[in-house]
Amino acid sequence: MFALTFLNPNPRLPSPLFLAKSTPESALSRRSRAFSSSNSYPWRPNLRFNGFKLKSATVPENVEGGDLESGSLVKGLKLGGMFGVWYLLNIYYNIFNKQVLRVYPYPATVTAFQLGCGTLMIAIMWLLKLHPRPKFSPSQFTVIVQLAVAHTLGNLLTNVSLGRVNVSFTHTIKAMEPFFTVLLSVLLLGEWPSLWIVCSLLPIVAGVSLASFTEASFNWIGFCSAMASNVTNQSRNVLSKKFMVGKDALDNINLFSIITIISFILLVPLAILIDGFKVTPSHLQVATSQGLSVKEFCIMSLLAGVCLHSYQQVSYMILEMVSPVTHSVGNCVKRVVVITSSILFFKTPVSPLNSIGTATALAGVYLYSRAKRVQVKPNPKMS
């Protein structure tokens, strides 16, 4: 028995020696069994096949891992560069725009000019085929017009606020955007927030309230305009989310481009109605008599328009590369960068309580972003 076990390592399979001695069979049957794939030692072909499978799965895996690692590094560097450009364009836009509004207090005209710069840049983009032209149906156009109205009012009200109060204060108030995002998502989409999201809104509201009470440049027009811009901008974002669900939805860049063009068309007659026709040599002369030459005024106005469209375009490009939650965190950091740079450039006086209020509001925005990340994180499931 021991000898049989030694000769046959697998006791379940009959030993070849045992078969040879105990089973009488003809030479023809032995020959046919030798050439039969089903009867001849079934473990050997499987071992060879498994070894082949192991090699073919191992070698490309190492090569592919290196490609993925280098690809992720390139993508990370590209994304980091785009975030840097986004922040830099925001800083320059707020600096140029504030200097223009200081000497030329016509926010509707300024906003229309800036949207006109964006419209020209979009036309160049489509003519040079840098991005495919959009195709949309009449039913989609109706929804896009609604988005354009919200976009127009958001930009106009932001410029009204920037013309009345400090840049840092306007952006502190605009840190309230998550509050209105949650509110409008409940009203328009029926999406109820989690407890963590509601808790993260408390420091935002408290911080903005403290910063408002201690703001040296506070006035009600500037405050209410910034707050109203939060409502219109977040209405646009929530409606965009609803619009982008369909299979025939436009991509982010084309959607933003069409919204910009329609906003420009809507705002030109509105600017004439609100401000009057203020693009005359006499009005420009009055504006330049307050510290800027005609050349400086024109260059700053043009650069503000280019920076506005460029940073919004880059923002949409980043949104296509990352999740909305990551984009929200980046937007929070952007506010910190813009507020800090504007305080340093314009030498804005800031009290300790004002600083605490601003920091509290921005910390709340960051907590909101983290709470959103927890909410959207899927539960792992075994497949």
Curated annotation (Swiss-Prot):
Transmembrane segments: 76-96, 108-128, 143-163, 179-199, 210-232, 253-273, 299-319, 350-369
Gene (UniProt): PPT2
Matches recorded under Pfam families: TPT (PF03151)
A GO CC term attached to the entry: chloroplast membrane
Keywords: Chloroplast, Membrane, Plastid, Pyruvate, Sugar transport, Transit peptide, Transmembrane, Transmembrane helix, Transport
One GO process term, biological-process aspect: phosphoenolpyruvate transport
PANTHER family named in the record: SOLUTE CARRIER FAMILY 35
Protein location: Plastid, Chloroplast membrane
All residue ranges annotated as the EamA domain in the record: 93-212
Signal peptide positions on this chain: none
Transmembrane helix keyword on record: yes
Source organism superkingdom: Eukaryota
Function comment: Phosphoenolpyruvate/phosphate translocator that transports phosphoenolpyruvate (PEP), 2-phosphoglycerate and 3-phosphoglycerate.
One MF term in the entry's GO annotations: phosphoglycerate transmembrane transporter activity
Similarity section: Belongs to the TPT transporter family. PPT (TC 2.A.7.9) subfamily.
Expression sites (tissue/organ): Widely expressed in leaves throughout development. In flowers, expressed in sepals and pistils.
Transit peptide: first to last position: 1-55
Full protein name: Phosphoenolpyruvate/phosphate translocator 2, chloroplastic
Bilayer disposition of the protein: Multi-pass membrane protein
Primary location class: plastid
Keyword Phosphoprotein listed: no
